[in-house]
Each structure stands twice: as C-alpha cells, then as structure tokens.
Amino acid sequence: MRPNQTFKPLTLTIFSAFALSAGTLTFAQNADNDVVQLGNIVVSATGSEQLVEDAPASITVISREDLEKKSYGDVTDMLMDVPGVNITGGGSSSDISIRGMAPAYTMLLIDGRRQNTRETRPNSDNSGIEQGWLPPLQAIERIEVIRGPMSSLYGSDAMGGVVNIITRKVPVEWTGSVRNELTLQEDSDSGNIYSSNLYLGGPIIKDKLGVQIFGQKFYRQEDKILQGFANQDKTSGSIKFAFTPNQDHDITAELARSIQERNTTPGKSSAATDRFGNPNEASNVSYYQTRYALGHVGRWGDLTTDTYLQHSKTDNPSRNMFLKNSEFDTKWSLPLGSHLLTAGFHYQNEKLRDLGNHFGSDIQKLSRYQWALFAEDEWLLTDDFALTGGLRMTRDENYGSHWTPRLYGVWHMTDNLTLKGGVSTGFKAPNLRHSVADWGQATGGAGGNAVIIGNPNLKPEKSFSQELSFLWDSRAGFNAGLTLFNTQFKDKITEERVCDSTGSASCTIIPGGHAFDFISTRFNVDKAVMRGVEATASWQALDNLKFSANYTYTYSRQKSGPFEGRALNKTPKHMINASVDWDPNEDLNLWTRINFRGKTSEYQSRTSMADGTASYAFVDLGVNYKVNRNVDVGLGVYNIFDKRVTNEDYGGTYDGRRYWLQLTANF
C-alpha cells in the first residue's frame, strides 16, 4: 500500500483547516500549528483540496518561490516553462494556448472565479488583454495549470484547460513588501519596461478581521518595430477584507480596479500607411475594469460549503463597448465513507452594450444568461485506486441544455509509480455577437471596410478528450512523467467569406445599403483532432541543486471543412523547456533556462491558410541575492544569444537581449 494513503483522515483534516478555494482563506495559519502543508496541495482539479499526485487531472503547480526568481510582465511570462502550454501572438498580443487549442478555449480563474472579458474587444477574440486583469506578482501564492478540458467542473470556455491564480491569504501579523523591476533593452528599437508592485496585509481585529491590499504599476515604452510591442501602461489595485466570526465561517469582501492603456504610433509599432496607401492614425485604446466579490466558506461538521457572488464591469470606451458580468457559484463537499462528494450550482449573466454594429440595424445591446448544476464523486475503491466521476448540466438561454461528463482514475501502482487516465468532454457556447443575425462586426484591420455577420444557426463547439499518464517519484529527489493525450474537436466555428468585392463590384448589406470590401460570417463546419505527448523530469541532485526539463509533441489535423488535412492552429510540433537552479548558500540563488519552440506547419488563420514558421530558442540566466532579512535583489540577462524573432518571419515579435534588475523590500 502506498504510504500516507489515508483518504478520509486527510480529507477531514484538509476540510477542517482550509476552504475549498485557497483565495477565500481568511487568515494564514501559524507555522507551528498542526495543519496540512500546502506545498503539494491543489484545488483546481476537483474544486476541493488534494495532493497533486492524487488529483484527477494533468496539473502543474508554479510556486511563489519560483515566481519570485524571474521577470514577469504578466501571467504569460509565468507559464513559459509549463509542458503543453504555448504562448502565442508575441508583441502586445501574447496569449495562452494549451495542448494545441486556441487561447479562447483557456479559462482564466482568480481563486476559482472566472475572468472573461473577451467580449470587450473587436470580434471578441483579440489577444493580449485578458491576462492584464490578473493579479500582480506580489499578490500570487501559486498558479495551478490544468491541461485538458474541465467543462464538467467549470463549464463553457474550459475546453482547452484552466489557469487558476491562487492569491495570498490574509496574514495573522502585519507584513508588506514593495517590488520594483527594470528591464533595459540592448536594442534601442525595443521599449524598456518598468514595474512596481505593492503588498500590505494584516489584522484589524486579532483573529477576527483582517485586510489585504495589492497594487501594481506597469509601463512599457513603444517599440520602433513594425508589429512590435505597443506602449503599455497598466495600473491596478485591490483591497480584500476577511472576517472570521468563529472557526466555522470565513467571509471575504473584495474590490479591484484595473486600467490598461495601449498606444501605437504609425511608423513605430504600427505601419505608417494602411493597405490602400493612406496615412494611418495613432491608436490610443483604454480598458477599464471594476470587480466586486463576496465570498463565504462554511464548515458544518464534515460538510464544507464555498459560495461566492461576483460582479465585474469592463469598458472599452475607445470602441464603445461595455460589458457587465454577474456570477453566483456555490459548492458543497462532503466526505462520506470512501467517497468525497461535491455538488454545486452556478449562474452567470452577461450584458454587452456595443455601439459598433455595422449591419444597419439599431441593435446595440446583447445579453445572455446561463445556469448549471454539477456533481462529482471521488470514490476510493481501494487504498491505492480512486475513481472520479463528474457530470455538469448547463442550461444556456440561447443554446438549451448541454451535458458534460468526465471519468478519471488514479492508481498508485507502487510507492513510486502512479498511473492516471480518463476521458472528459468540453463545450463552448458561441460569443454574444456571433449568433445575432442583425449584427455586423467591423473587421479588415486599420483602414479596412469589411464586416462579419452573425449567424443564429451556430451550435456550441464540443470536444471529447482522453489522456493517460505514468508518473514516477523515486521519493529520493527524482520525478518523471509521461502523458499521452488525444482530443477530438467537433463543430468548430470557422469564419468564411460570403462576398469578396473585385474590380468595381461591391458587397452591399440590406438594410443600410452600405458597400463593403468583403462580408464574412461564421459556420459550424470543422472537425479536428489534436494529440500529443508530454514528458517531464525533475532531479534534486543535491539539497541546493535542481535540474528540470519537459518536452511536448503536438499534432493537429482538420478532419473536415475547406482546409481538411491541414494543421488547425499555429502550434509548434516540438517544445522543450529546461532549467537549472542552484543555491550556493542560503542567501544566493543562480538559475538558467532554455525555451525551445519548434517549427510550425501551415495553419488556419481565419479564412485562409498561413505559412508555417521556423524554430527558435531563448536562453536566460539570472541571480537572486538576499542582502538581509528585509531586502532582496535580482539580476538577469534574457535572450542571452540575442535571437531575433519578428512578426515578418515568425508571425509575432519577441524581445532580443535585455537586462533585468529587481529590488524587493519586505517589512
């Protein structure tokens, strides 16, 4: 029997000490309290806390200790080393793709709460903004990344995977920190980066009421590189109150405000003229978000409940787009004999006001509600084998009911070897604009005169995935894993041209009578398959020396539609990440890493196939030094060999050699 395989005692300990979501924990435990340590515990795989090796999913955890060692502009930088994850876009449009699925299928969570504002961008799919709403580095306790569909637990948008940002708990004693970072580019055409993060937290009334404050300022100068980084200015802050009336109840109230500004100048990061030869104008775009949240965790004997109410308002005034999202979610978890039962209810309501309808109708407001019931049972059939079954029924105002089941097994074959595997389903409802017949969304880029018409006959996209994992833990510092995955994608929504003007011909919309260069709409036409391999290894060679590496192979093919037999997305076939971490003494840390991205084949880019791109690799090196108990410094050289990756050659722009400096003061 595997050591420490005590399902019910461990479960009871966890549920008596912690909330279902780490972000709603009220006060951090004292170091000498007899509690389960969080180092190997995750919450995203089932909504309940469990050891990583027991979690019914392929999951990667990035600890706070690892996050503090390197330079991060946003969460995309934090995920560079995760197997199966590809950071797409480049420049100011970086986004997160998991196992070959487009970024729109990756769900972003903060403490298990959805963050979805893609509707506030033109065509609802522009990248690079979504992660700007996530907490700053100083606010993060850890990041949990689930690779593969999780719609049975999280609903629509979790078809590709989940990134869950777990924030820090309110401390029992007053503490704080200020972290300042500077990145200087060797190439004067690339913009320098400045950022500052603030954290402050502590008790107002001992053991009853606490407060936590986060703040961030991020600024990047504009590149003088076509399709390079825009001028970016981000300001965000949040305040959270945590109230513990007694040991059985935790109540939180949170307010967060974020502002993102992006500016491009013709002749710098944007083209001097449009495709017709007319001078381009400078682009100044601002996004504003305000988010309110109330949370409650209750412990009622063996039963634990986790409930939250969240409302967010996101504005894109430069494009006259305004989005309101309201959500209510409750989970109930109960260990019962050899079962861990979880059930819950979720409700969300989206309201979009967009003044950019080019169809000629007077429609400006779109809305949709969705509710869901879900249940899971983690059943410990033997001391070494657990089977998790889950089912979610989602009722969408526009698309009716959808059932998303999953079944996953975890077998600890020996003390060292674990076999995991299962099947899961996913679905994603079309975006609000996509299915409205009288909606015409502007497209065609700067100076363009084109429109995409909504299609009321669209169906939700669906997926069916299988995976199998072998995990080896020597219990002496060496870990390795091999995962095989296969995803069948059905009813993919594809954009198609229905009219393309040539010569003196024109495409005219009735009503309105406006002539466009081209008119597109969307259809459910495509089937696709994504499959691959993820291999990982980690070796703690000495107490102060660690080697880590992972490799991902991804294959994708469209099985139907006009591009049958071609690759689906711009995903490298081969990806390799490797790192070395060395602590010569308790105050000094040295690290280096390499990120390799293999070539991509031709891939579908909206209505046509785009050329594949060549391979590239980045090598980084850094050092962190603890000056004293209150001051830390970090130095780094990124892209040591100055590999140039430009939009012209690679379809995205990444920085060349640059130098990083950070100073953190703790108090």
Task: Please name every model-derived segment.
Residues 114, 119, 270-272, 351-353, ...:
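Surface-exposed extracellular loop regions of Gram-negative outer-membrane beta-barrel proteins
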Residues 115-147:
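Short acidic/polar hinge/loop motifs at secondary-structure boundaries
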Residues 325-334, 338, 344, 366, ...:
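Outer membrane beta-barrel strand-and-loop segments of large Gram-negative receptors
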Residues 6-7, 13-15, 28, 201-203, ...:
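Conserved C-terminal beta-signal and adjacent last beta-strands/turns
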Residues 171-285:
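Periplasmic-side early beta-strands and strand-to-turn transitions of outer-membrane beta-barrels
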